[in-house]
Swiss-Prot record:
<dbReference type="GO" id="GO:0006412">
    <property type="term" value="P:translation"/>
</dbReference>
<keyword id="KW-0687">Ribonucleoprotein</keyword>
<protein>
    <recommendedName>
        <fullName>Small ribosomal subunit protein uS2</fullName>
    </recommendedName>
</protein>
<dbReference type="InterPro" id="IPR023591">
    <property type="entry name" value="Ribosomal_uS2_flav_dom_sf"/>
</dbReference>
<comment type="similarity">
    <text>Belongs to the universal ribosomal protein uS2 family.</text>
</comment>
<dbReference type="Pfam" id="PF00318">
    <property type="entry name" value="Ribosomal_S2"/>
</dbReference>
<dbReference type="GO" id="GO:0022627">
    <property type="term" value="C:cytosolic small ribosomal subunit"/>
</dbReference>
<dbReference type="InterPro" id="IPR005706">
    <property type="entry name" value="Ribosomal_uS2_bac/mit/plastid"/>
</dbReference>
<dbReference type="InterPro" id="IPR018130">
    <property type="entry name" value="Ribosomal_uS2_CS"/>
</dbReference>
<dbReference type="InterPro" id="IPR001865">
    <property type="entry name" value="Ribosomal_uS2"/>
</dbReference>
<keyword id="KW-0689">Ribosomal protein</keyword>
<dbReference type="GO" id="GO:0003735">
    <property type="term" value="F:structural constituent of ribosome"/>
</dbReference>
Length: 246
């Protein structure tokens, strides 16, 4: 996908906020006005905020840092999973487990158990179990896959969070804040921007708008990784050539 422009955001309805009676006054500086009792987000703020966030993410990924994609509500869940996977980044797209960051040691236990079940499934151990045991093990594996499957390869705490709907994911943001992990978040007119280091003012309910944000983040992650890989190849080739010359 090419760089996001104003037309993309307009077509996706990124400028449509919530009903005026549900607004959060802390978002007033990002609001252009109201139409039919719906707040209109000023995309003149959204586009540069998105680009600033993308620049930060690209720089972090180029340094081999991990960006945790978080979007657990129905409109965001599938998109977050698909784009995070494409980006090669961890994700949480079902319920956020309390302590997922602040009590990561406990989460590691769940990840270890998931890996054990995956290994059992692959090495034929399931075939030696009774039907009831297979059913119970499969259910456990499915449950763990939903809750920690997206972070099983994270290896440790993430370096930043990319969040869709900051009110819905407030527990995740609070945990990140406690640990000093920067938060990049899509913030709608009814939401509280507190605790979000990089605010992207925009509609967080429209599937098309969520797709644009997540796709843009994934794109810069992929680009940063590709650039890092090509730089590594160039350095390696240069070193080999210098060694051959000697």
């Amino acid at each position: 996908m090419a760089q996001v422009n104003m037309r993309d955001l307009l077509k996706a309805g990124a400028h449509f906020g919530h009903q005026t009676r549900y607004w959060n006054p802390k978002m007033s500086k990002y609001i252009f006005g109201a139409r039919n009792k719906i707040h209109i987000i000023n995309l003149e703020h959204t586009l540069p905020a998105l680009n600033d966030a993308l620049a930060v993410i690209e720089k972090m990924v180029a340094s081999n840092n991990k960006i945790l994609f978080v979007g657990t509500k129905r409109a965001a869940s599938k998109i977050v999973k698909e784009e995070a996977r494409r980006a090669g980044q961890p994700f949480v797209n079902h319920r956020w487990l309390g302590g997922m960051l602040t009590n990561f040691k406990t989460i590691r236990v769940s990840i270890k158990r998931l890996r054990e079940l995956e290994a059992m499934h692959e090495d034929g151990t399931f075939e030696k179990l009774t039907k009831k045991e297979v059913l119970m093990a499969t259910r456990e594996q499915d449950k763990l896959e939903r809750s920690v499957g997206g972070i099983k390869d994270m290896g440790g705490l993430p370096d930043a969070l990319f969040v869709v709907d900051v009110d819905h994911e407030r527990i995740a943001i609070n945990e990140a804040n406690k640990l000093g992990i920067p938060v990049i978040g899509v913030v709608d007119t009814n939401s509280n921007p507190d605790g979000v280091d990089y605010v992207i003012p925009g509609n967080d309910d429209s599937i098309r708008a969520i797709q644009i944000y997540a796709q843009a983040v994934a794109d810069v992650c992929v680009r940063a990784k590709d650039n890092s890989a090509s730089e590594f190849v160039e350095v390696t080739e240069t070193n080999e050539n210098e060694a051959a010359a000697e």
